């Protein structure tokens, strides 16, 4: 209820703009030389980001600030036209920004089984990377084991043409069968591991992370 207070200093976007975002450009350029594709987490912060005053005890004391948005990304692609990015855009506010640059979005299946899937056929868009879960999620088996409404997930998978006898295997199969350009599956999901294989528990410090 208090949000996540990370304690990170904010970027001085006014100064970075004067330098043609050189700080970012150099880092993106280097990473682009050693990796085929980059994943940008918290992409929404280029649109708006949550600013918390120094010394705050919780994140509730912050406010939304406009990010550099199109000006920043125009500069990035002018200087690095070959840059390939996957962007974490789990909120609808940044879909227009993502689509303007034809970027691959992230579709995390654990987050995408909601009320809407009761009304329309479940579908992963082509211009995306599908994940069963990320490093912040529980392994797929743990997630499914702890669900209250397992029958709903089973119904969704049956509607997609699967038998529904092994729902976890159906979800894994759909990740590879769907229209997404890339499927990204954690190894613990492929091996069928549960709670014992979780690698991170957000907002905590301990053996998980």
Residue positions per predicted region:
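Low-complexity, glycine/alanine/valine/leucine- and proline-rich hydrophobic stretches
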Residues: 191-209
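Alpha-amylase-like alpha-glycosidases and glucanotransferases acting on alpha-linked glucans and related
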Residues: 1-184, 188-190, 194-195
